Amino acid sequence: AEGLVPTGLSVDGIDYRKSAGNPLPTITDPRTLYLNARQGMASSDFSGVTILLPKEAGLTELAEQINGAWQKDCSLFFSVEEVPQEEFDKRLAADSYTIALAPIRAEGGSVYQMLQQFTAEGGGLTGWSAPIYSQRLAESAQQTGSARCALLADCERQLLEGCAVVPLLGQNRRLLLADGITGLVFDPFTPVLDLTDA
């Protein structure tokens, strides 16, 4: 992912990703940062850590890849817990998780609504809150054009720098089907449409 907000979204006719630039924090050596942070911690401090996923969201393979990388680079392995979407939403809302892989949506293509999910008014997706974040987001609703893009970009950077979220991948391809169509298999990452059983 190039940022939390995927490519292809615009704000007042301006390409948001192009205007906002790269919001990802610069971490020159993530492994050294991790090793420094882990000093004084025992491996047992990480026991019981699980990666929470919504069932049937297509995130199982991604969780396995992440777990493999953590095991290889950091000698850590976490169990994966897949739960129905309703339970997943409840646990996110109750802050009852250690690590969660949560799809973040830009409903209607709105950067503002996407970022609002991280405020109390927008549902508090991660339980993270920062008054300056909410203030800047509210200010962005009063602005237009490049001024609005700049405020939204500040919000996106704040989320990423505060490690409230870490974007793993972005998807802006989808397939819409008419009612009654069954048996199609769509892989948005390739993209491939399999009509074998249709």
Regions found by a protein language model. Name each.
Residues 19-26, 54-62, 80, 84, ...:
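Extracytoplasmic/periplasmic, Sec-exported soluble proteins
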Residues 51, 70, 92, 98, ...:
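Hydrophobic, well-ordered secondary-structure elements that form the walls
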Residues 9-12, 56-58, 105-109, 173-175:
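Solvent-exposed loop/turn segments at secondary-structure junctions
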Residues 1-68, 72:
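Append "and occasionally in soluble cytosolic enzymes with long acidic Gly/Pro-rich linkers
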Residues 2, 36-55, 103, 143-179:
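Bilobed periplasmic-binding protein-like "clamshell/Venus-flytrap" ligand-binding domains
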Residues 10-29, 91-95, 116-139, 170-198:
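Short, solvent-exposed loop/beta-turn-alpha elements that line the ligand-binding surface or hinge
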Residues 71-122:
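Periplasmic binding protein-like
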Residues 29-36, 58-65, 69, 87, ...:
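Extracytoplasmic/secreted proteins, especially bacterial periplasmic and envelope-associated proteins
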